[in-house]
């Protein structure tokens, strides 16, 4: 589960970077 957190943060960061 802990290995999934950085992936979620990376996805949110990518979405935030898109906007």
From Swiss-Prot:
GO biological process terms held by the UniProt record: defense response
Q: Which residues carry this modification: Phenylalanine amide?
A: 19
Give the subcellular location: Secreted
Q: Which UniProt keywords apply?
A: Amidation, Amphibian defense peptide, Antimicrobial, Secreted
In which tissues or organs does this protein occur?
Expressed by the skin glands.
Q: What is its main location?
A: secreted
Q: Please give an example of a GO cellular component term from this record.
A: extracellular region
Q: Which family does it belong to?
A: Belongs to the frog skin active peptide (FSAP) family. Phylloseptin subfamily.
Q: What does this protein do?
A: Has antimicrobial activity.
**What is this protein identified as?**
Phylloseptin-J1
* Species annotation: Phasmahyla jandaia (Jandaia leaf frog)
């Amino acid at each position: 589960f802990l290995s999934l957190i950085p992936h979620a943060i990376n996805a949110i960061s990518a979405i935030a970077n898109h906007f």
